[in-house]
Amino acid sequence: MIPVIALVGRPNVGKSTLFNRLTNSRDALVADYPGLTRDRKYGEARLENRRFIVIDTGGISGEEEGIDSAMAGQSLLAIQEADIVLFIVDSRVGLNPADELIARHLRVHNKKTYVVANKIDGMDPDIALAPFYELGMGEVHPTTATHGRGVRSLMEDVLAEYPEIPEEEQQGEATGIKIAIVGRPNVGKSTLVNRLLGEDRVVVYDQPGTTRDSIYINYTRFDKPYTLIDTAGVRRRKNIDLAVEKFSIVKTMQAIADANVVILVMDASEGIVEQDLHLMGTAIEAGRALVIALNKWDGLDESHKYYVKNELERRLRFVDFANIHFISALHGTGVGNLYKSIEQAYQSATDRFSTNYLTRILQDAVREHQPPMINGRRIKLRYAHPGGHNPPVIIVHGNQTDDVPGHYVKYLEKTYRRVLDLHGTPIRIEFRTTDNPYEARKKSMTRQQFIQKRRKEERDRNNPRR
């Protein structure tokens, strides 16, 4: 399971800046759930082959309602969710009484904690860091989150005890397809798991949130190995029973990150709600293959079914690559068809394609519809090669690639999806500007070449063509 890191500290010490710095890597996922987390923001980030989840909390001052009540809120939950705590302090302000109160609470929770002295630019580190050693929490790490200084060395220290994840293990090839069942509470996730397994392996109650933690279940179907990951559902903040569902968002993000295929279960009777869309976005940004299951479909009348289908067509255009199934997990209607989409999505996400094949597709696409002209010059796309899988990444080389407009990127995505017959997985197309290897050679001439060129120009002037 990937580690969870909470950023804790007083207001305005740079927690959000550090959060943005950590989650701005190429594969970062930033998930700010409106109305769900309020003062907590969740993001997935990566340092080389180490993935981790970051939680940004609201500031703790301890001056208005007291540190105890403040810590009992969002930051306390973040600390409970976390494996590691980054305690952010302000180097310019120095040690503050609120810092000492926060440190006292962190010691009570006995979590692995790193003191991070932010805003160190322009200061003598020895003088600036000295007061924070009085907290008695070990080494103090100097950083300037705004410019990224010291952040990489900090994270290398923090993640040193967490081994890198080999590519093969990330893809789950040894254990078969890993399927994450995600969705809001009480949409029927555990019922669907039991239906897929053919037995009551997961306790099911009517009360939302009875699946407290993610459950990993290994099984085989027709001699093929699978792992089902059942998660606690995501629910609006005001409805969360803290004793039951305080870990739901982190567990859902961890399950998505750990899965090969995500089945998003939605309640057909409620239609499409904002949290469903956020979960779809989370899966897509994580690059996971996606299957959508609308549960409780058999309980709808025809007019309601017609309305829901129209809503799906209108609001889910951004996931038009995902297969949609109308099911009843309770009665088993349509559940068996999910496996075909799971297999298809996994195959599409993990297929390998040759450079020659990808380049031919690119050339055909360019012949059919050329890129636009920028500043009087046509964008040239020369060749393509694979850049990874799960999800498929295609690297396109050419000139002026920074100017390729979004609509042309969409055109290339659709072309590759159609020709490669990819279903259920997002595609990522990245561009590289290729330098002309002969350009420097054209610009520079030897002395002898220069003399010969001048003589030729002089002859041409003296002997003009008639």
Swiss-Prot record:
Tell me where in this chain the KH-like domain is found.
351-435
Entry's transmembrane regions: none
InterPro entries in the record? G_ENGA, GTP-bd, GTPase_Der, KH_dom-like, KH_dom-like_a/b, P-loop_NTPase, Small_GTP-bd
- Positions of GTP 1 binding: 9-16, 56-60, 118-121
The GO terms describing molecular function are: GTP binding; ribosome binding
Q: Which UniProt keywords apply?
A: GTP-binding, Nucleotide-binding, Repeat, Ribosome biogenesis
One GO biological-process annotation of the entry reads: ribosome biogenesis
User: Pfam families attached here?
Assistant: KH_dom-like, MMR_HSR1
Region entry Disordered, spans: 442-466
Residues forming the EngA-type G domain are 3-166, 177-350
Q: Which domain of life is it from?
A: Bacteria
Please list the residues that bind GTP 2. Answer: 183-190, 230-234, 295-298
Basic and acidic residues composition bias: residue spans? 455-466
Could you tell me what this protein does? GTPase that plays an essential role in the late steps of ribosome biogenesis.
Report the family membership. Belongs to the TRAFAC class TrmE-Era-EngA-EngB-Septin-like GTPase superfamily. EngA (Der) GTPase family.
Q: How does it assemble?
A: Associates with the 50S ribosomal subunit.
Protein name (Swiss-Prot/TrEMBL): GTPase Der
